[in-house]
């Protein structure tokens, strides 16, 4: 017997290949995506309707629901329920047909984009949700740029077609012209506003006519007719039918051809139309998404690209959340599984510290609800109890040492000193600030002047600062004061402290240090920034800073 034959017949080899086969089968069934949108585009509504069709919930509850209705499944923090907006990212896993779908629900409110940036690091696909009356909006553009940095596939869903909106062809043109992204309409709307009659599915050449379900709470009844069915003339007004025919001919004649490779490269976006509130087009979108979306794939690490069927387990932390259950004062690390098979009670290595950890109480997350998890595969997200060990971007693994690329910090736009007026509350104040910093609720910076000890909160929007104050008071019993600072732009100095010292005094800017002690310059406006960039290119100012892998944050 040759060496190759001997190895192939050995129990160890069979065990590895059986495990790889099991992982490959699980990966084939996995789809993972995040929804990016501007506030009020209907993100929470679409999320709930996807869960409704996936059987994960029996009844969808509007976000700003009446008291008799349920609160939205994906909004669980008390402040979110009060305001009717999503502030933190949550993870929702559900099954549809033979697929397991991991929906990384991100905040749609404009003040919470940094949490969204981090969530996009764990997503394989993004769904760009747009209001058909408004088209592209500023928040969506920002998030699109983050998707482009990672070259992930983007699926577009134009929502609120049952309300007056812009012309569909005009909306496609806007995406192509402003984002440089080619479009392919997978389905096409029949009318709009109060004359919205449904959609035409170009994949199967079928017309889907929808009846509104009661407030969209239940799955919509779907009447499906083949294109060319004589009944269409009785069910759709002649002018709408003619308009549909003309627009379809135009799409076939001058529209982009379908190209799955271009979709996977993030160069072509499949486009869908519907109304999440009334369930129009939601299931059609879901079925096409499962066919077209990228399955969990290889991810770049310190030892090269890691394929998902690599038999050793690995994953990275993309989010931390404290006090998901205020009764237990818990802290949860959200881990995206990248390779291998995760199993309850397994022992892993923590790359940054080198410590060995036993993962004894892993959890499957569904908004605020959790259940103990026995196993998970690439593309899944698991919740781990976090006794202060994990930081955003951390890698855990079995087998040979590896580390995944860090999750970058993005430039904040609002800055304020956080003051603790009550000296007797110093310990809970420090603990609260430290835990909220670890969680990534806000960036924490400090003055380069060591005499100024108060932390500087750095956020992408005012509401983020309010959330920190709210949580410090409600979860740690500490009342705080904010002292706004007159800056709106931050840039990391890639050249480091040495280069900064050689440059000497800089006008119209203030120097601070970030969580890892790296120099950051704060500017009052873009004009001041451009002036310093022109005068001192050696500073190498950056708007995005990588997570400082392997470094411990400085003490609060």
UniProtKB/Swiss-Prot annotation:
Source domain of life: Bacteria
Domain tr-type G: 28-297
Residue sites binding GTP per the record: 37-44, 105-109, 159-162
Keywords: Cytoplasm, GTP-binding, Nucleotide-binding, Protein biosynthesis
InterPro entries in UniProt: EF-G-like_DII, EFG_III/V, G_TR_CS, P-loop_NTPase, PrfC, RF3_C, RF3_dom_3_sf, RF3_GTP-bd
GO molecular function (one): GTPase activity
Pfam family, one: GTP_EFTU
UniProt-annotated location(s): Cytoplasm
Keyword Protein biosynthesis listed: yes
The keyword Zinc is annotated on this UniProt entry: no
One GO cellular component term noted in the UniProt record for this chain: cytosol
BP GO annotations: regulation of translational termination
PANTHER family per UniProt: PEPTIDE CHAIN RELEASE FACTOR RF3
Entry's family note: Belongs to the TRAFAC class translation factor GTPase superfamily. Classic translation factor GTPase family. PrfC subfamily.
Function: Increases the formation of ribosomal termination complexes and stimulates activities of RF-1 and RF-2. It binds guanine nucleotides and has strong preference for UGA stop codons. It may interact directly with the ribosome. The stimulation of RF-1 and RF-2 is significantly reduced by GTP and GDP, but not by GMP.
Protein name as annotated: Peptide chain release factor 3
Organism this protein belongs to: Synechococcus elongatus (strain ATCC 33912 / PCC 7942 / FACHB-805)
């Amino acid at each position: 017997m040759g060496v190759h034959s001997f190895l192939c017949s050995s129990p160890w080899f069979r065990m590895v290949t059986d495990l790889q086969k099991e992982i490959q089968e699980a990966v084939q069934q996995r789809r993972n995506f995040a929804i990016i949108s501007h506030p009020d585009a209907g993100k929470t509504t679409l999320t709930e309707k996807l869960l409704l069709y996936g059987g994960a919930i029996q009844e969808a509850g509007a976000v700003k629901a009446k008291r008799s209705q349920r609160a939205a499944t994906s909004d669980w923090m008390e402040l979110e329920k009060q305001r009717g907006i999503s502030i933190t990212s949550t993870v929702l896993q559900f099954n549809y047909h033979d697929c397991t779908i991991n929906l990384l629900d991100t905040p749609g409110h404009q003040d919470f984009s940094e949490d969204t940036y981090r969530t996009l690091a764990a997503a394989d696909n993004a769904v760009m949700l747009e209001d058909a009356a408004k088209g592209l909006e500023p928040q969506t553009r920002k998030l699109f740029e983050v998707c482009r940095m990672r070259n992930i596939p983007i699926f577009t869903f134009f929502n609120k077609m049952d309300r007056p909106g812009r012309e569909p062809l005009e909306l496609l043109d806007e995406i192509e012209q402003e984002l440089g992204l080619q479009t392919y309409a997978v389905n096409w709307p029949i009318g709009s506003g109060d004359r919205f009659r449904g959609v035409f599915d170009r994949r199967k050449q079928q017309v889907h006519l929808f009846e509104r379900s009661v407030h969209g709470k239940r799955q919509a009844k779907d009447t499906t007719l083949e294109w060319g069915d004589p009944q269409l003339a009785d069910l759709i007004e002649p002018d709408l039918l003619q308009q549909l025919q003309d627009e379809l001919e135009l799409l076939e004649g001058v529209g982009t051809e379908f190209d799955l490779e271009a979709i996977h490269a993030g160069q072509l976006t499949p486009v869908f139309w519907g109304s999440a509130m009334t369930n129009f087009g939601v299931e059609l979108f879901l079925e096409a998404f499962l066919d077209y979306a990228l399955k969990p794939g290889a991810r770049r690490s310190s030892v090269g690209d890691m394929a998902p069927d690599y038999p050793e387990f690995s994953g990275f932390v993309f989010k931390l959340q404290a006090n998901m259950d205020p009764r237990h004062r818990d802290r949860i690390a959200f881990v995206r599984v990248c390779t291998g098979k995760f199993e309850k009670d397994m022992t892993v290595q923590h790359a940054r510290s080198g410590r060995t950890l036993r993962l004894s109480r892993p959890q499957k997350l569904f908004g605020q609800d959790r259940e103990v998890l026995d196993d998970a595969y690439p593309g899944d997200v698991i919740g781990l109890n976090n006794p202060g060990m994990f930081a955003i971007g951390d890698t855990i693994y079995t087998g040979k040492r590896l580390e995944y690329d860090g999750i970058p910090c993005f430039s904040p736009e609002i800055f304020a000193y956080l003051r603790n007026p009550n000296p007797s509350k110093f310990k809970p104040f420090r603990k609260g600030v430290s835990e909220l910093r670890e969680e990534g609720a806000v960036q924490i910076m400090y003055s380069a002047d060591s005499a100024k000890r108060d932390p500087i909160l750095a956020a992408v929007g005012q509401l983020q600062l309010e959330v920190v104050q709210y949580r410090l008071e409600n979860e740690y019993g500490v009342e705080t004061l904010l002292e706004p600072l007159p800056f709106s732009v931050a840039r990391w100095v890639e050249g480091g402290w040495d280069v900064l010292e050689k440059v000497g005094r800089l006008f119209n800017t203030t120097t601070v240090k970030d969580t890892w002690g790296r120099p950051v310059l704060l500017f009052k406006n873009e004009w001041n920034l451009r002036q310093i960039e022109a005068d001192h290119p050696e500073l190498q100012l950056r708007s995005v800073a990588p997570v400082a892998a392997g470094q411990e944050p400085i003490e609060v």
